Amino acid sequence: TVQTNNVNTEETRAISATEVSQTTALELEQTTQTQELTELVTEEGTIWNQQKAKQLGQYMETWGQERNQNYQAYQPGHSVAFYTIQVPDDLLSYEPKIQPAIGNNPIWLNWSETGSEGGYCLVAVYSDSATQVAQKHVYLFTLVNGEAKVYVSKEQPAEEQPYLFLKETSNTELKEQFTNLVNNL
């Protein structure tokens, strides 16, 4: 009888451990699914997200090919040499290495994964600078108070002026594509 009790106790412990393990695994799976759903809802509820960034990348690849240009994406920590500066790294922060300006008005860019910060939210950078020898382009995709704006620079910054002069792109197709992505159209 003592031996039978020991076996039953061991079986009970084994069953209990298995049940606890299964319950814990189920709770963990439910928690993970809840977190993933929350992240998806949160990302989809933002003005800019990874899905939109991916769609912009696909568009820029096609758009560049149509113009015999090769555009690559850049972000903080992975900049492109645009003439004498590194974009976007040299343009970001309260005291950037070189000040971005629209016309003669300096602006301050903030890198943003969601586009929900204030000011000029830089959500994407594309340039053909790594593959172009002559005329280089850098496109800054920004959200200004929720409005999609695409700025371009084709000029080498002058050494005597610490500015990278930007202007809104005149390419209607590019502006519309970015606006449609931002507005989920």
Regions found by a protein language model. Name each.
Residues 58, 64-137:
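Mature extracytoplasmic domains of secretory-pathway proteins
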Residues 1-66:
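N-terminal, intrinsically disordered, polar/charged segments of Gram-positive cell-envelope systems
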Residues 32-34, 38-44, 53, 67-68, ...:
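Aromatic-enriched hydrophobic runs in primary sequence
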Residues 105-185:
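Extracytoplasmic electrostatic interaction patches
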